[in-house]
Structures are given as C-alpha cells and as structure tokens.
Amino acid sequence: PKESYKTFAHQIADAIPPAGCDNQRGGWYDMMERTLKDGEEHYRRVWHDRKAWWQQEQGILAYYIMAGVYNDKPEYLRFAREGTAFYNGWFLDYESGGIYFNVLANGQPYALGSERGKGSHSMAGYHSFELCFLAAIYSNLLVTKQPMDFYFRPDPQGWPDNKLRVAPDLLPAGSVELAEVWIDDKPYYDFDKSGMIVSLPDSDKPLRVRVRIEPAGLGFSADLMSFENGIGRFALDGDLTKSKLPLFKKELEKLTGLTGIVVDMTNMKTIDDTGWNY
C-alpha cells in the first residue's frame, strides 16, 4: 500500500482512543464530540453514554488489523482485546441468544424503542458473525500466527473452471499460504499454495472440501483429522523439530481421553531425534 495510507491509518488509530474509547471498561462510545472547546481537556459524549454494536465491530477489527499488519505499537493489540472483552461480556445475550443493539457504558442492555430488537435493517448476521469470523482470522493468522481450517461444500460445476478460491479475506501479500487440502476426508494436492485456489475434480455431487491456511513460514502444523474411541488421527506437515514440538503437544493436549495416535506423515519434510523420541 501507499506510504500515505499507512501514515493516515496510524493517525486515526492514535487519535481515536483518547476521544472515543472507554479506557476504564473497554469498548467504544456511540457518539462523541469531534473537537475540544476552549478550556476542555476531555472529549464530551453526545446525548448519552451508550455503546452501539456497530462501533464495537469497527473498533475491534481495526485494531486487530493494525496489530497484525504493522505490529509496531503494543497498545493496538490491547485496544483490540479490551474491546473484544467488553463485547463478549456485555453485548451477547447468554440467556436468550443474539446480540444487543445498544448497551450503556457499564454494559447494561439498552432495550427501549426500536433498539430493543436484535435484528433490523441496520443490524443483521452479517454484522455479528462477520465480526467473529474476521476477528478470528486477524488474531490467528496475523497476530498469534496460528493455522486455521476452513470448510466448503461446492456444488458440481458451480465454479468457473472448477476453481475454488479459499482466501478468507484480503490479507497482506505473502503473509499466509494454503498449506493442505482434503476432499471428502482424503488428502488432495491440486491447489495453488500462494494464490489459495483449489482446482476441484470433476464430480456429479457436492464435495466436502477442507483447507488449512497458515501464516507463511510457519514450518510445521499438526491437523486433527478424526478422534474416535480414544484414537486421534493427525496429519503432520513440515519440519517437526525441537522448537516446533510444543505445537504438536498443544494439539494433543486438546483431546480428552486420548489413548493413542495415528500419524499421517505424507507431507512431512524432516523430523529430528526429539520428535521421534516424543
């Protein structure tokens, strides 16, 4: 991107927190004064102290992007996580389901008039599950450098030239790559790693496609293919070295009642003595 875009993004990211962020409880206020009047030290809220779901989405995603793409100011990740914590704590209705349209500054739901509803012309699933989807992508692929699996069920002949594009979002060029593909639970190798395009085979029925996208240069990944009767079946990819072994251990520790493992090493490149001994 142009350097001017980066500069402007940083200007906005640095200006918003002192003006519109609740630095005590997390989250972003609905409406704030844009300027300070003579003698004022703090930006004033307009009409009320409510926090709307839309501002939380924009704030959370913006700061995850800034943290993941530039990684030059630790406060960007802090603002993203504080906003996430407030949203998860107060905007989700854990009893009846759904997302509140508005809450007060302290998190109490604001349920008056048209804002008591959880869906409207300006609030839909696009705004709620999009936040979950993109926040997971940015935090995993860009911030914490964790691989992610995505699932598709394309109809036969439903895509031009049978090309299935699986990039989850517009991410910085070269930051992620398509590492592995499975079709109907079987490894599949006809795909473009950097372009993240799967060349689908001819079929007369919908295909079950699973892809693993990971940060570029990750070096190793362990993917759980199935877990039945205490046996976990994993597909390993890359180089299993002493430094990468904790990644494999982490995946194993997620399973309760594990009694044995079966390992698919088709995509393994190397494994050192530490890996073999483990």
Label every PLM stretch briefly:
Residues 218-235:
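Short beta-strand/loop segment at the start of cytosolic alpha/beta domains
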Residues 1-217:
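Glycan-recognition and catalytic cores of secretory/periplasmic carbohydrate-active enzymes
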Residues 239-278:
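Amphipathic alpha-helical interaction surfaces in cytosolic regulatory modules
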Residues 55, 229-230, 257:
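Residue-level preference for short coil/turn positions at secondary-structure junctions
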Residues 24, 236, 273:
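Short glycine/serine/threonine-biased micro-segments
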Residues 207, 235, 269-270:
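Secondary-structure boundary/capping motif
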